[in-house]
Amino acid sequence: MAPPPLSPLLVADFSHVLAGPFCTMTLGDLGAEIVKVERPAGDDTRAWGPPFVDNESTYFLGVNRNKRSIVLDLHDAEDLRVARTLAEHADVLVENFRPGIMAQFGLDEPSIRGTNPALVYCSISAFGPAAGRQLAGYDLLVQALGGLMSITGPDSDTPTKAGVALVDVLAGLFATVGILSALHERDRSGRGQHVEINLMSVLLSALANQSASYVLAEQIPRAIGNGHVSIAPYDTYATGEGMIVLAVGTDKQFGQLCDILGISGLAQDGRFLTNELRVLNRAPLRKNLERALAARPAEYWTRVLTAVGVPAGAVNNIAEAFAFAAQLGLQPIRNTEDGDSRLGRQVASPINLSATPVSYRTRAPLLGEHSCDIRSWLAKLDAGRKTA
């Protein structure tokens, strides 16, 4: 089998919490060597819980596989020297401190660039390096300031956050794309560059059609529950037993839906002839659909609608979602190759490469688990450079 696509790249991971670690875990899955630098107390998320497994936070375990951990106190001169040695030998450095923090230790991009011109240096912040550099930022704050909460929830009077730190995850993915792009360019020029990612810009980009409605049409979107601002029926609906999701994107699908529900005439109703009309008349549309859906349970409607190609599905909880993915043969849970049956149980990467698949080599590291080995390894690298 061919080596992993990012082997043997070395990533100096100075990141913490979620956005940075999600990025570096993705790079590690693709074969990069990840050295995670932690302060003496460890990554903040090591203490975030419950739940815990064997006294380890599942939050931390979920985004730190395929990494080695070294504890460094950057206020200590020797530890700072080790950190700088790591940065000078790395192909990639990822950090998500508030802008200016790395510069206080001489670990900022300009300081490292002189001795490592090929370094791809990635900085992730909440609000960017300019006017927002002093603003503290967690995902929730960005969801609020970035507009996501205003379009999420039952109505505009009940702003609601997403059920996961979605902006952090998206920032990690955008950082990964930026890093891979910079590495590709480095193959041509031999030069590294600075990749800057901020959560605010990530969210505005990820709002996609909602952002476009404001930028292009000067319309300010609002929350409409589980519905879609531009498509109907595209929502959750009550049935005789349980809820069902309908995602009807075409007039043909709407006609099929009405046929299956036994209300074929609804498709010819002047209020519902086109998607635009259905969006304008979503309230009476819901009333008619739920009246028909009440005749049977959600399981029945999902089965018969799916059979004719109308997008429909149950509203699963997380356990049901994993079970469904397993039924589809997607292997949603993997075990790391180190044989740790508890801490090594991992959510599968969604990246599937035919020739160079992702790997699940090791569980998330214990705090400082590899400190001695990494120090010795870096000392040898440094000695080799000085004698070269």
Label the model's feature ranges:
Residues A41, A126-G128, L199-L204, E241-M243, ...:
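Glycine-rich beta-alpha junction loops
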